[in-house]
């Protein structure tokens, strides 16, 4: 059995824009439903959702039959948590709250086997298809895509250094936490925050490093795309359900 190809990583390297959704429910059914909708990637958020490795595994299995990449965000830049997600078969991870180049290097080490990294070796996991993939340990990193999240003023000031760490495949700018760090909590589209985000994407574009963002503000999203953002999440499942439910109820008020 061959190592699964990471369409998302290949698309980023080819300069192709990737449009995605945020998945927050511990529901493989919802994940599979979303996988039928034509998006390029779906991210399971374990940072701000009551989900763990078991639910992440169910998510990865649910989306696997479809032409969509399952991305997982661990709760923290934690080598043990990252190891579990990789062993479950995740090939693309978004690491939250990366503040410095050293923290980016720690994330790289966590997804890499020794001697270059610290990922623990286990031969019988879903990632190896329970031993069916030959030479998995030697080839795993060819298809692992590591995205790091910059979401504070201090981290944004170091975005070029963080993005330049060998092994980082993309940098995601988080508008919500960034706005809070600028003193505008709950205002991710504030002009000062927006200007900082667009400046960050311009720097990433100059370096040739893919940039990403999540927002429901189409004005911010389009400006980010024009500035160079390449992997763009345009909605959150919980928000879509709530918005549709409220709109339908209003029609029958």
UniProtKB/Swiss-Prot annotation:
Positions annotated to bind a divalent metal cation: 151, 177
EC number per UniProt: 4.1.2.-
Record's catalysed reaction(s): D-glyceraldehyde + pyruvate = 2-dehydro-3-deoxy-L-galactonate
Domain of life: Bacteria
Cofactor: a divalent metal cation
Gene Ontology CC terms: cytoplasm
Matching InterPro entries: Aldolase/citrate-lyase_domain (IPR005000), HpcH-HpaI_aldolase (IPR050251), Pyrv/PenolPyrv_kinase-like_dom (IPR015813), Pyrv_kinase-like_dom_sf (IPR040442)
Catalytic site: 48 (proton acceptor)
Keywords tagged on the record: Lyase, Metal-binding, Pyruvate
Gene Ontology MF annotations: aldehyde-lyase activity; metal ion binding
UniProt entry tagged with the keyword Cell membrane: no
Site location (Transition state stabilizer): 73
Site feature (Increases basicity of active site His) residues: 87
Family of the protein in this entry: Belongs to the HpcH/HpaI aldolase family.
Protein role: Aldolase which can catalyze in vitro the aldolisation reaction between hydroxypyruvate (HPA) or pyruvate (PA) and D-glyceraldehyde (D-GA). The condensation of pyruvate and D-glyceraldehyde produces 2-dehydro-3-deoxy-L-galactonate. Has weak activity with hydroxypyruvate and D-glyceraldehyde.
Name by which UniProt lists this protein: Hydroxypyruvate/pyruvate aldolase
Origin organism lineage: Bacteria, Pseudomonadati, Pseudomonadota, Alphaproteobacteria, Rhodobacterales
